[in-house]
Amino acid sequence: FRHVPIVTDIEEVKAQSTPLEVFNFMESELLAILPDLPKNRGVSRFDQAGVASILVRLYLNAEKWIGISKYEECEQMAQAILDGKYGEYSIDPDYRGPFRSGINGYRSKENIMEFAIKKNYFEASWLYNMWMHYQDRYSLDNDWQGWNGGNLAPSRDLYGNLYQDKLGMPFEKFPDEDIRKKAFRVISNDGDYEGFFLMGTQYKFDYEKGYGFTDEVITGTEEYNGKPLVYVDQVGRFSEGETGLAKGSHVIYGEENTGYRLIKFPWLPQSKDLFQMNSIPEIRLAEIYYSLAECKYRSGDKIGAARLLDAVRKRYYKAEDWSKFSYESNISKLTDDEFVDELGREFIGERHRRIDLIRWNRFSEGAWWDKTPDATNQDVFPIPYRALNANPLLKQTTAGF
């Protein structure tokens, strides 16, 4: 919103402050509380590193929101976090570690701030419901039905060809050698798993083994009622034949099997008391590495940026493949476009993408599947109608509204 009132007394009705005034207020509040907080207490609570990380976010995005570069301050705060000034953290050697934190007593040292989840007490039900099909309960071993609402934007058109949009194709932006680019499956009785995506033909959970799948296919309930449920990396009315394809590929023309499903935050077997028991990370040390890398990249230190990115990325590749994908070993690959792609890969599903694209001038201006460049600036939310009615001192400050 940018232009919001700064209210410190609930009885006050105040007009909007400038973006710079809002920024300065937020910064001063965070800096004031920082030394009074404990260290390494980031399970459902903000500690010193959590507040320092919010300051990193504030400084990293300052130039876009207030027109004043704060990359030097961002670099200093990020480096202090990496140096352990605000607590001891480290990159998890296992790519799944930050997202299964809380399972069987495990706590990932990468997570600076995570929201603890526990079934029947504090659940992330919306996160499951948004991505999961009604029938996924039979493959994932739980009794939830899901809304079948969300999926990855498609990488392929109606005829299986890759789209060419720079900012699209989230699944295919992962190299085939990246070990995250696998179909999700539980691989042990302890809830170990692999892969970040539900894709292709879906099979029933193997209750006899306690993990994995049987050979029994799960069937659809709508367009593919009684037929195998096969997730495709496309959007279109395929069930209607040529008539359906003629409608094109748009948001309104999805089917029940449309799109690969992100399962980065794993839904583990309910029969093992693991379902809805893993935390949801809000801030990972990886974000601090990437923020510091971006500061160095913007200042011209590409090698320094590459080393920081590689420190996180190395866990995604087998040793024999790493030299081909290391930025330090292939520095010419680290361009603006590649940096934006890498942010998308690392933080897919973690609610970073919009603000990252805005910071890199690719949100309103950018194009991807079913989204053309916007004629008006969509970077800033409009002041809500209800807020305008409730406070006569507020003005609509967002252009185009």
Feature roles, as predicted:
Residues 1-6, 19-37, 44-82, 113, ...:
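Extended, hydrophobic/aromatic-rich amphipathic alpha-helical segments that build helical scaffolds
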Residues 38-39, 61, 270-274:
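Flexible glycine/proline-enriched surface loops and loop-helix/loop-strand junctions
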Residues 187, 191-314:
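C-terminal substrate/ligand-recognition segments
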